[in-house]
């Protein structure tokens, strides 16, 4: 009905026809119908308990769904509940997180788990406002957990949803500004509350418990978590970034102002990105027999408290690196040039060259900050960030 109605409208020059609230309300039915037919089967959707929803949402921040799947399975097997997460040793936690990046997410998970044990009896609170008080949880994650796990009418606005809505409304506002996100959260929350109240009124109007029970089992019944996930899924699968969206597959095609104007790729509006800073490094694999030198990074800053291979600023030959590290030529068995590697962070790029330095004796390299560890321990004990993956693969 809505599709036919909006398809008959003519775009108005210089203004958006119809209020955003009306356009949002008209989107609900086709969006949910599409989602129920096209949603992906994901492990965290199988049993949407508060803990698993929380862990998955934190992992999915800045990380692709396919990349998260094996990490989620491994994490849930090792730390299946809030109690085990609160008690885990930090190095063990970081090792489980190794490869996902943005390690502050893992540390905040543990901090939040400790808070849950101390203040909430080891349970995730069934309140968006209370969830929002936990370390590492922002508005999106709080809304996702509250709506998916507890069926509460709380919005969950991530980058996917922002992209869909800015195109739906042809919104010229800067999408990186809090004002736009706050506006959309209010719009979505009002729609969630309206639809949830309609559902509850329908259920309470049932004459007998049997009819109400049947309605509760019906897939046609409105659920806030499903509604939120439908917007996210549409942005991930159809209204995609970095090119032309798949408008011909979109259930909101005839409702979308950007599509009607042929301006899909102009939204969302963002300021130009600042170029990333480039840092050159020489990564040294200093080996003696089956051991390799690693050291722990600072507890603050990039890759805080993780382990790394010895490295130097700038690009240096093996001989130059050995000299700078105080390794005598007489203590070197052999050297080897290793492949170059590039790792991109949000604000900086590391351009690395690798140098292998094999020692004749254990005492050939002296540094109190360095540990000589067995290669096998790189796999099961010490968390080495993905930035050094090329060099870790050489060792294991």
Question: Where is each model-derived feature located?
Answer:
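Intrinsically disordered, low-complexity, charged terminal extensions of DNA damage-control enzymes
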Residues: 1-41, 46, 196-221, 236-396
